Amino acid sequence: MKLMELTPWETPAVIDYKKTMEQFGVKPIVDVLGDLKEEHHFFRRNIILGHRDFERIVDAIKNNKEFAVVSGMMPSGKMHFGHKMVVDLLKFYQKYTDNINIPIADLEAYWARNMSFETTKELALNEYITNYIALGLDPEKINVYLQSKYQKVKDLALILSKRTNWSEMKAIYGFKGETNIGHVFAPIVQVADILHPQLDENLSPEPKPVVVPVGIDQDPHIRLTRDIANRAKEFKFIPPSSTYHRFMTGLLGGKMSSSKPETAIFLTDDEKTVKKKIFSAKTGGRETLEEHKKYGGVPEECVVYELFLYHLILDDKELAEIYQKCRSGELTCGKCKKMAYERVVEFLKDLKEKREQAKEIAVKILEGKY
């Protein structure tokens, strides 16, 4: 059997999550959630399906212990509903900790994607930080920073770079001879992003659990970070925990991507654009209305149902009713798309108003003046 190849820069269009988790030693999260399963619909609906050492975070939440969260961003395009998933998770964690760290990977963007620092900063400010605040993140509980400007992380990356070598980096990431050295070093900066909450400003140990919520494509960073944490004995690091969520399917099937506007609903899309995208979306309906009513739809293959599942319907009973009506053929694709369109438009209209209020706060956060 051919093994799955994962890198943070090339996500497969289709992922067999079960096989991939088994291959890389990621455990099913349902085994450790306990009562926490009812605290977020991502847990209840198996949208978050895997973990490494998440029991540490469950223990911290249950017993009111200190822990930190790290969730980086590499702005390469407009923010869409797939990105919103991360904010929904951070909103969950901010109920239990005020130590939420959001690195902006401008160094990685420069080295790996040839993006200028100015472009990355502008995208981060206008598309991401502003939306993060508008979506409900508490500015008092987040530490947002540019990698290129945060000396603590850069210093730590230089120190930790001694704890790995070219052979390991090549094996994990598949780097080639023509890969620039900055790109090779970028994962070490990510390691420092993840581990720095366990140190004070003088890089002295302040060990605490850290959780990193990611897609499975980011697991190479997690594995490297955990290995380096165990090697750097002088810092007394607790290896970071991680959770793994499913990717949202693109509107036309396959991957959702900022570089392919037709595959995603952006948080700044207007009403006309949303309507066109949703009514063109791939569904789990049959080829004809007659067949759909006779055999029923397949919501598991429907991108519109996925919007309900991930974002638009938080009430489990209401979602179950839509599922059953689709399966029975009672609910047609046209009616379902109309419902999704109306809910998305209502959501984006409200978000637009909140975004106007969030812009000034976002600027202050990025300038370190909030």
Swiss-Prot record:
Q: Which InterPro entries does this chain map to?
A: aa-tRNA-synth_Ic, Rossmann-like_a/b/a_fold, Trp-tRNA-ligase, Tryptophan-tRNA-ligase_arc
Q: What residue intervals hold the motif 'HIGH' region? A: 75-83
Localization recorded for this chain is: Cytoplasm
Which molecular function GO terms apply here? ATP binding; tryptophan-tRNA ligase activity
**Keyword annotations:** Aminoacyl-tRNA synthetase, ATP-binding, Cytoplasm, Ligase, Nucleotide-binding, Protein biosynthesis
Give the enzyme's EC designation.
6.1.1.2
Please tell me whether the keyword Oxidoreductase is annotated for this protein. no
The record's listing under NCBIfam families reads:
PRK12285.1-2, trpS
* Protein known as: Tryptophan--tRNA ligase
Organism of provenance: Methanocaldococcus jannaschii (strain ATCC 43067 / DSM 2661 / JAL-1 / JCM 10045 / NBRC 100440) (Methanococcus jannaschii)
